Each structure stands twice: as structure tokens, then as C-alpha cells.
Amino acid sequence: AEFKSRTTAEAKFLRALYYFHLVRWFENVPLMTAPLTNPSAYNQPQAPPQETFDQIAKDLTEAMQDLPKRTMKANGGHATYWSASAMLARVYLFCKGYYGTDLNAGGTVIDAAKIRTYLDEIINSGPFSLVPVYADIWKKANEMGTESVWEVSHSSLALLSGSTSNQHQAQGNYNVLYFAPRGIA
């Protein structure tokens, strides 16, 4: 039961993350929260942005209930309570800043005071701290380090497909190597 609830929470976190990207890029997107079981249902109408933002908030607040309060490293790179609450804050700031509205997470209003509570908890109670030397953030030893609330893990061992186009490569850590400050990575 614990595995199922945690896995469902991780799926809700990822759905919220993906919808956050979609709604920022395209604004009106089809909002699907259940599997499509019939081909006639494939043509879904676009949802207004506020409806999508509210679903994102609902997914994140529900996910927070079943995600562990561990660091990314201790949780094997999976979503955590901390990453969901930080993501909710980011979503709120975008929605409030761009649309001027609060979020509604299934009947619970998410406003600035609630977000402040989550951020204070991350800063004061979370297992996070700044790395003393900024340049050390980019070192392999600090992957999923004390500054990491949410991080996508990559491997430098990924094999390239032989293509010279980045579009067709398994990039691994190459972006970090290309774009990190010189002499750091």
C-alpha cells in the first residue's frame, strides 16, 4: 500500500511538472486526468489556463501527502515532499505574476500566505543548505547535493548514437559540461 501511494504521488508530481511546462508554452492545453478508453475521446477540448493551474496545484498538494521528507540523494532521485512543495511555490509565483490569480487545489485556496509557509518550511526545516564554494555545485560529487530540491539525474556514461546532432544523442551530462563555468565540471 505504501509503495502504491508513493508511486501514485510521484506520478502526480510528474504530471504537474509536465502540465506546468505545457501551460506556460501553449497556454490552452487539453487537460486529461483519466485514461482515454475510447478512440472517440481522443479529440479533447483545450482547458483554460486557470483550470490547468488548479489541477497542477491539486496534483502537487495531493502528492505532498505521500512523498517522503528526504533529500533527493536519500530518495534515489525520486520526487520528494520538498520538491513538490517547491514546485507548488514556483507554479503559484508564475500564475499569480502572469494571471494575477491564486490557485485552487480541489477546494483549498493556495495563496501567498500558504506558499510562504511551504517556503519557510523548506528553508528552515528542510535538509538543505548552500554549498560553501559556488563552483563546487557543478562537481559530480555534489550531484543531488545539499542545494538540490529537485534535480534530473544524468549519466556521463551514456553512449552517443553516432549522430552529430544533439537532437539525436543521449546527452547524459554533456549539457553540464558544455554550459558549466569553465574549469569547474
Regions found by a protein language model. Give the residues of each.
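Aromatic-anchored glycine-rich loop motif in surface-exposed flexible loops
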Residues: 1-79, 92-107
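An aromatic- and glycine-enriched ligand-binding surface/loop that stacks and positions planar moieties
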Residues: 61-62, 78-185
